[in-house]
């Protein structure tokens, strides 16, 4: 699967490895630059996240995930992902997401959602923008 720029987060790259829109699960590899911040969000299903290089954390916790770490997020988890400003290398992750990710405003209201279907479409749009043919092997 090709790496393509993630149009939702400038400076990031994504590689969608698998998307099962019927089961509501997808596997995504990401390359995240220093200083990245992702909006506060809640997961309706479990998330498994492997850190392959670099470091990242959640604003709500002191722990920083580093290369070689694994993180399990239970359904209902709410957090704000960030990559430290002083990272000296790109952070690369592999994430398996079940269910929906709900992006929240400061009051906790849902302002956007993503899931296997929206990530599949976003990947296709990013492939087209990068002039990369749509891979057919990522669907169940």
Each language-model region and where it sits:
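Short acidic-glycine-tyrosine-enriched beta hairpin
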Residues: 21-22, 48, 56-80
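A short secondary-structure junction signal
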Residues: 28-29, 60, 105-108
